Curated annotation (Swiss-Prot):
<dbReference type="GO" id="GO:0098599">
    <property type="term" value="F:palmitoyl hydrolase activity"/>
</dbReference>
<dbReference type="GO" id="GO:0016790">
    <property type="term" value="F:thiolester hydrolase activity"/>
</dbReference>
<feature type="active site">
    <location>
        <position position="228"/>
    </location>
</feature>
<keyword id="KW-0458">Lysosome</keyword>
<protein>
    <recommendedName>
        <fullName>Lysosomal thioesterase PPT2</fullName>
        <ecNumber>3.1.2.2</ecNumber>
    </recommendedName>
</protein>
<feature type="disulfide bond">
    <location>
        <begin position="165"/>
        <end position="176"/>
    </location>
</feature>
<feature type="active site">
    <location>
        <position position="283"/>
    </location>
</feature>
<feature type="glycosylation site" description="N-linked (GlcNAc...) asparagine">
    <location>
        <position position="206"/>
    </location>
</feature>
<comment type="function">
    <text>Catalyzes the cleavage of thioester bonds from S-palmitoyl-CoA or S-palmitoyl-N-acetylcysteamine (unbranched structures) but does not have activity against palmitoylcysteine or palmitoylated proteins, branched structures or bulky head groups. Conversely, hydrolyzes both long and short chain fatty acyl-CoA substrate.</text>
</comment>
<keyword id="KW-0378">Hydrolase</keyword>
<dbReference type="Pfam" id="PF02089">
    <property type="entry name" value="Palm_thioest"/>
</dbReference>
<feature type="glycosylation site" description="N-linked (GlcNAc...) asparagine">
    <location>
        <position position="245"/>
    </location>
</feature>
<dbReference type="GO" id="GO:0047617">
    <property type="term" value="F:fatty acyl-CoA hydrolase activity"/>
</dbReference>
<keyword id="KW-0325">Glycoprotein</keyword>
<feature type="active site" description="Nucleophile">
    <location>
        <position position="111"/>
    </location>
</feature>
<dbReference type="InterPro" id="IPR002472">
    <property type="entry name" value="Palm_thioest"/>
</dbReference>
<feature type="glycosylation site" description="N-linked (GlcNAc...) asparagine">
    <location>
        <position position="289"/>
    </location>
</feature>
Length: 302
């Protein structure tokens, strides 16, 4: 009997320890695949999906398993096509992605792409965007000489470009769709076929529906900085812009905010606007700067 007891003792102890085995064993690494919302990336002017290879690497490193789609549409010179045409093309591309992601998606939209994405959020009545990350985008328009403009309109300067952009011919170019001359506000309001509409600055029959759609977004993350060198004024990335004297008025001083014409004031009131300014970054390096990614983008990719 004593020998039999000694033989059975380990088995008895094993039975007693079974409930505690999970505590005694090392924890397995958490499985990330499938736990993060898909990310959709929209490029900017004269850009392509290749420009975002660093950003793609950063996301894969920090949020392993995230499905990231860098949309390869309207690349290079095709990015000059009218923005409403681009909105339609990108809409057809994002709908299937959203339909496969019932928990929602994130949008990272760079430069001109930020305006495309804001229009998408306005016209899509069933979008499920959680974080809309606007990366150095001229959200309140552009009023500055850049190499792009000098190449496209070599005989025009900033002060007289309105003559081109506020014509039916000019509105066929994406850049002119958000050209915002503070010295010719009436012409801008009457001629702008894109920015004045998504801003709710000009009455149109879809204004109420677009505002409701835009407010479906979970969070609006605004990124930009004083050393951008292209977005003019750089505060346009944060919905600031020039007045008639070229003094920058911040977002809270803008008529579109005060009237809450497309939902900015409502978003801010519910704590859904994140502003992340960062100095020392030029326009073409926003999407490859690791510090910027860690500080301003990664925290919002849940």
């Amino acid at each position: 009997m004593p020998g039999l007891w000694r033989q059975r003792l380990p088995s008895a102890w094993a039975l007693l320890l079974l409930p505690f085995l999970p505590l005694l064993m090392p924890a397995a690494p958490a499985a990330h695949r499938g736990s993060y919302k898909p990310v959709i990336v929209v490029h900017g002017l004269f850009d392509s999906s290749y420009s975002f290879r660093h950003l793609l690497d950063y996301i894969n490193e920090t949020h392993t398993g995230t499905v990231v789609t860098v949309l390869d549409l309207f690349d290079g010179r095709e990015s000059l096509r009218p923005l409403w045409e681009q909105v339609q093309g990108f809409r057809e591309a994002v709908v299937p992605i959203m339909e496969k992601a019932p928990e929602g998606v994130h949008l990272i939209c760079y430069s001109q792409g930020g305006l495309v994405c804001r229009a998408l959020l306005s016209v899509m009545d069933n979008h499920n965007v959680d974080s809309f990350i606007s990366l150095s985008s001229p959200q309140m328009g552009q009023y500055g000489d850049t190499d792009y403009l000098k190449w496209l309109f070599p005989t025009s300067m900033r002060s007289n470009l309105y003559r081109v952009c506020y014509s039916p011919w000019g509105q066929e170019f994406s850049i002119c769709n958000y050209w915002h001359d503070p010295h010719h506000d009436d012409l801008y309001l009457n001629a702008s076929s894109f920015l004045a509409l998504i801003n709710g600055e000009r009455d149109h029959p879809n204004a109420t529906a677009w505002r409701k759609n835009f407010l479906r977004v979970g969070r609006l993350v605004l990124i930009g900085g004083p050393d951008d060198g292209v977005i003019t004024p750089w505060q346009s990335s944060f919905f600031g812009f020039y007045d008639a004297n070229e003094t920058v008025l911040e977002m809270e001083e803008q008529p579109v905010y005060l009237r809450d014409s497309f939902g900015l004031k409502t978003l801010l009131a519910r704590g859904a606007i994140v502003r992340c300014p960062m100095a020392g970054i030029s326009h073409t390096t926003w999407h490859s700067n690791r510090t910027l990614y860690d500080t301003c983008i990664e925290p919002w990719l849940s």
